[in-house]
């Protein structure tokens, strides 16, 4: 027979937990939920600060010329003239991504891009929630928290951009250096 000492359980309720600490899991859950509701185009806008912001929108107008691993002649012979329109560039690049998505370099770059993209948008959500809460509550060290969240957002944004740019270049490099398949 095992006896449960109820007095220990009652003492747990007396343990002083600050409301800020107790609400942290709720805030994290809300951030994850809100992040899941944000469409990927808006997340790209949060990271790149421009319209047509998905990584592939500048694949053939910018990135194709910015990486020495990319064989331009080979890529042109496989794909023909590069599209000028950002949406057309993204469509063509996305088809190449699907072709090479099993490559470990592409897979890892894609995973890191998505990780940093979501972390960036969640940080911005936390920043906005914190900003809104300052109108209702007096928050100790609010300026420090603002600066910390802003710094975190900027670092994550730069990391997201770097991962996205690397993903685009990796796909273009793989396509330009892979042997042409008959029927391609």
Model-assigned labels for residue ranges:
Residues 22, 26, 30, 34, ...:
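Lipid-exposed faces of alpha-helical membrane segments in multi-pass integral membrane proteins
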Residues 98-144:
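Transmembrane alpha-helical segments and their cytosolic interface motifs
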Residues 35, 39, 43, 47, ...:
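Membrane-water interface at transmembrane helix exits
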Residues 154-184:
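Cytosolic/matrix-facing juxtamembrane and C-terminal tails of multi-pass cellular membrane proteins
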Residues 40-104:
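Charge-rich cytosolic interhelical loops and cytosolic tails of multi-pass membrane proteins
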Residues 29, 70-82, 169-179:
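Juxtamembrane/interfacial segments around transmembrane helices
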Residues 1-63, 144:
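N-terminal first transmembrane alpha-helix
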Residues 23-24, 141-157, 161:
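Pore-lining and gate-forming transmembrane alpha-helices of multi-pass membrane transport proteins
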